[in-house]
């Protein structure tokens, strides 16, 4: 039986796969597992924090999850609508036992998900998720009377604490208590995807001094990610060009990722953003071990550019949790994914799109260069990605004919490109990726491999 927890927690179609009962059971199981942690003796009343994105299903799922936690003896702080990295940050600074966020990130509105954070704001390791799954739905000696928990609601305080933290990353308040404005005069456009950062990102950018035009920041429960945000940047590209802004930033539904647009409307992806920030950290003496942590999906062009700047790369599997694990293991300060998840360990324990936007804008100002000029230092090899659906994804690495096809293409490309087959962490599909010197060559290689995968692995 497959694991319930995927790379981003438990996800599925809300009210079909992810029901109120399942949310209740997950809250109940989580307090049993995480409440048994030896650190829980720290407080007489154990506490949890719950936040969510703007999906309409978040209301009933938050209520059910909080009910499971409070029935298990935890006091629950409902932070309301807040970005996923905001939940991680508040889990740490409010010293609660655990945090949970209800979101399906960049997925369509009908989906939703539940993801947990341990004390300190770190995502749970696989072992803890497996423990939660193992006790899911089991009966146990639940508390009664004064032993049950309460649920409190305080969106404003939670949001303001998080915004203060974000702004302080580039504009720390000095002894005079006045707020510096390092982004003063920077004209930008922010696309909030009608998601969780619809309040946070515009306010943080404005507090830092930016002149912000905001689009897609009117969530109604149904329009999250709909033709908006990092998965649909067309509106942002058009608005940047039409408004004369110097750049734009786009978030996904839970704002754990950020992509950017230069003054001409060209996309600046996560690899290029990481390259810009890694170079800035190296120049400031803050890039630990002169190393950036990337995933197998990062473009070969990024690695080649960084190598010429004296910056090494360490590669992990896809998923910001695996990036963070490697960062902690090797004491690295910066890492992330091509998709726009960027982890700046100086300020965060997970990918934070709003933090990424602030630090990227700050680097544009400090460098005196345009985003287009900065991104040009990190050229990308032409890349093609094909999703092959309805296949036996776990056989992609073992099927003899598929592996023989991979070897043929790798030999053909030599040192000028690469190929990658990656099973999806959440869907029955295999992602086939190819990079080459020309777009035509990348397309041809990817098409050939995708056909072999479909022919050999279709269910």
Regions from the PLM with identified roles:
Residues 41-53, 187-189, 290-296, 333, ...:
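Short glycine-rich phosphate-binding loop at a beta-alpha junction
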Residues 32, 36-41, 47-111, 203-261:
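N-terminal small/polar loop signature for handling phosphorylated ligands or for N-terminal nucleophile
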Residues 246-247, 284-459:
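Phosphate-binding and adjacent anionic-ligand microenvironments
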Residues 13, 112-243:
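Gly/Ser/Thr-enriched, mixed-charge loops and adjacent short helices
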Residues 86, 130-164, 168, 181, ...:
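Proline/glycine-rich low-complexity loops and linkers
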Residues 1-67, 71-72, 98, 151-188, ...:
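An N-terminal, well-structured beta->alpha segment
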Residues 50-52, 190-192, 262, 346, ...:
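Short glycine-centered, acidic/aromatic-flanked micro-motifs in structured strand/loop junctions
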């Amino acid at each position: 039986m497959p694991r319930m927890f995927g790379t981003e927690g438990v996800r599925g179609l809300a009210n079909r796969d992810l029901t109120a009962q399942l949310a209740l059971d997950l809250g109940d199981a989580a307090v049993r597992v995480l409440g048994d942690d030896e650190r829980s003796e720290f407080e007489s009343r154990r506490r949890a924090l719950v936040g969510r994105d703007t999906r309409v299903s978040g209301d009933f799922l938050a209520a059910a999850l909080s009910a499971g936690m409070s029935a298990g003896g935890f006091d629950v702080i409902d932070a309301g609508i807040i970005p996923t990295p905001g939940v991680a940050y508040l889990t740490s600074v409010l010293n609660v036992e655990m945090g949970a966020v209800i979101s399906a990130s960049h997925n369509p509105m009908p989906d939703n998900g539940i993801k947990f954070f341990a004390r300190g704001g770190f995502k749970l390791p696989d072992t803890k998720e497996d423990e939660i799954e193992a006790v899911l739905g089991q009966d146990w000696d639940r508390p009664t009377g004064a032993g049950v928990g309460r649920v409190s609601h305080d969106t404003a305080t939670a949001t303001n604490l998080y915004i203060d933290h974000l702004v302080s990353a580039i504009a720390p308040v000095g002894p005079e208590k006045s707020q510096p404005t390092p982004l003063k005069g920077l004209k930008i456009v922010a696309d909030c995807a009608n998601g969780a950062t619809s309040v946070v990102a515009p306010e943080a950018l404005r507090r830092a001094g930016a002149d912000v035009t905001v689009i897609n920041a009117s969530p109604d429960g149904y329009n999250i990610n709909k033709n908006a945000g990092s998965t649909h940047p067309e509106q942002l590209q058009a608005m940047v060009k039409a408004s004369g802004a110097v750049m734009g930033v786009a978030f996904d539904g839970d704002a754990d990722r950020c992509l950017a647009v230069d003054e001409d409307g060209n996309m600046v992806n996560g690899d290029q953003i990481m390259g810009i920030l890694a170079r800035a950290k190296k120049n400031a003496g803050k890039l630990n071990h002169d190393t950036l942590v990337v995933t197998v999906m990062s473009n070969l062009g990024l690695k080649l550019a960084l190598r010429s700047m004296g910056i090494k790369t360490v590669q992990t599997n896809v998923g910001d949790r695996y990036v963070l694990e490697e960062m902690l293991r090797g004491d690295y300060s910066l890492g992330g994914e091509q998709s726009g998840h960027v982890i700046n360990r100086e300020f965060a324990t997970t990918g934070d799109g709003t933090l990424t936007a602030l630090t990227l804008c700050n680097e544009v100002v400090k460098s005196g260069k345009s985003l287009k000029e900065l991104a040009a230092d990190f050229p990308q090899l032409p890349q093609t990605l094909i999703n092959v659906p309805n296949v036996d994804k776990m056989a992609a690495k073992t099927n003899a004919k598929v592996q023989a096809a991979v070897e043929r293409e790798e030999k053909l490309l030599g040192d000028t490109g690469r190929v990658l087959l990656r099973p999806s962490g959440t869907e029955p599909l295999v992602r086939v990726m190819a990079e080459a010197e020309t777009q035509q060559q990348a397309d041809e290689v990817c098409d050939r491999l995708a056909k072999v995968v479909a022919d050999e692995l279709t269910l």
